[in-house]
Amino acid sequence: MMYFVYLLSILLVLGFMAFASKPSPIYGGLSLVLSGGVGCGIVVSLGGSFLGLIVFLVYLGGMLVVFGYTAAMATEEYPETWVDSTVFTNLLIMVGMLGVIWYYFSGEVDLSINYDLLDLGGVEVLGGDYNGVSLLSACGGWELIFSGWILFLTIFVVLEVTRGEH
């Protein structure tokens, strides 16, 4: 299972590097959506099934609309892909910087996997995500109400900004 998490972590870093190499907005949005799915897969494989599902639904439900809108507004006749020279050069520079940082902080380049990721000393009846939801409703109830109120006001601000001159 840890090999799977390790593979997903590598895919997450590669997805963020694919976004940071500045391709066309269409490909940038695609790499962010795929990276979000991989990140939620990491959370699910580490035991946070509820949290991973909620983040996946919120991320893809909310942000996919934004990505679709920006991709429609920023259409190009010849979009830059990941194999174009400037984008590929940026990607190679980031891979080189990642290798230098890895070498600098580790002292040597060593491909080892730390299996002691979570310290599970005792038996847990509930996962951390269920405890977090119950704490949000109990101790953090005022934060939940405040966040809902802010979102409610945001709707009115957006409607006022986008309102026509009629």
Curated annotation (Swiss-Prot):
One of its GO terms (biological process) is mitochondrial respiratory chain complex I assembly. It catalyses: a ubiquinone + NADH + 5 H(+)(in) = a ubiquinol + NAD(+) + 4 H(+)(out). Core subunit of respiratory chain NADH dehydrogenase (Complex I) which is composed of 45 different subunits. Pfam families: Oxidored_q3. Its EC number is 7.1.1.2. InterPro entries: ComplexI_Subunit6, NADH_UbQ/plastoQ_OxRdtase_su6, Nuo/plastoQ_OxRdtase_6_NuoJ. Keywords: Electron transport, Membrane, Mitochondrion, Mitochondrion inner membrane, NAD, Respiratory chain, Translocase, Transmembrane, Transmembrane helix, Transport, Ubiquinone. GO terms for cellular component: mitochondrial inner membrane; mitochondrion. This is NADH-ubiquinone oxidoreductase chain 6.
